[in-house]
Amino acid sequence: MALVKELLGKAPQIGENTFLAETATIIGDVVMGKDCSIWYNAVIRGDVNYIKMGDKVNVQDNAMLHCTFEKFPLEIGNNVSIGHNAIVHGCRIKDNVLIGMGSIVMDDCLVEENSIVGAGSVVTQGTHIKSGEVWGGVPARKIKDISSALLEGEVNRIANNYVKYSSWYKE
């Protein structure tokens, strides 16, 4: 069973039809929408500020979600994939976004809807990724505009697949 821990009088609120892997950790002021999945060794730590996640968010294995005390909460929209080993910290991620494996998104960043942060990228503090952009690198920079094929073939496909994968573990 996942570690779901109340802290300072605030208990995580887990959305309907959400899968929590046995080694996932969810602490404090965390609110999740429905159809989310939190995978093995992922940590969602709402201890120093709040974390709000929309519907159909998948937080893949070993990812870390955190926020900044008295400054930056973490807000994640709907249909978002946070790749394996990613760190997402004190930022805003809108709907239909893919944060690639091993990426770091730092405080006060805004990732608008229908965007991709490529695997291994470092999105430095205060960066604004506009709607429909693909970013990558260290530090991350705009690579190109997203195509409809990339949006459907990656962003939506991965989010939908993780809803399916999580159903396998609930049986």
Describe the residue ranges of each PLM region.
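Glycine-rich hexapeptide-repeat left-handed beta-helix
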Residues: 1-13, 47, 53-55, 61-64, ...
